[in-house]
Amino acid sequence: MPGNRPHYGRWPQHDFPPFKKLRPQSVTSRIQPGSDVIVCAEMDEQWGYVGAKSRQRWLFYAYDRLRKTVVAHVFGERTMATLGRLMSLLSPFDVVIWMTDGWPLYESRLKGKLHVISKRYTQRIERHNLNLRQHLARLGRKSLSFSKSVEQHDKVIGHYLNIKHYQ
């Protein structure tokens, strides 16, 4: 736009790539694997849906309590396979204490590690779940804004996590 003329009647110009071209990363670059230690990591899953509530889509992610940032995330069904994909993304990081809620698959997957199971110690990640629901309308439980495709659902939420936590 030349000068400081107002641009009435036109949409503001943004430099965002179209969502179809987005390739959001799944692991943070703020924490260096091997050199930085994650003292307390909270893990949780968050429910969403694509098209209809019967087509559930789960966001699994790990949250660093001290740095207040998401470490890694994956999308999928609420199964051991999805949790396994998240754990493989987290394997390069040195995590001292894992904190989760009472979902039984966490217990079996974190066997042999220092693991605290308590709703009290997952308050921060639960608050982060609420922040995600407030910031992204498509994660709302009762909303007219829902994702129409799995690809767009994953890219929009992944892009949000990239902007807020990974860069």
From Swiss-Prot:
Residues annotated as transmembrane: none
MF annotations from Gene Ontology: DNA binding; transposase activity
- Asked if Translocase is a keyword of the record, the answer is no
Q: Name one Pfam family in it.
A: DDE_Tnp_IS1
Swiss-Prot/TrEMBL keywords:
DNA recombination, Transposable element, Transposition
Coiled-coil residue windows: none
Gene Ontology BP terms: DNA transposition
Q: Which domain of life is it from?
A: Bacteria
Q: Which residue positions does the secretion signal occupy?
A: none
* InterPro entries referenced in this protein's UniProt entry, alphabetically: Transposase_27, Transposase_27_IS1
What does the record give as the function of this protein?
Absolutely required for transposition of IS1.
Which protein family is named in the record? Answer: Belongs to the transposase 27 family.
Recorded protein name is Insertion element IS1 2 protein InsB
* Organism of origin: Escherichia coli (strain K12)
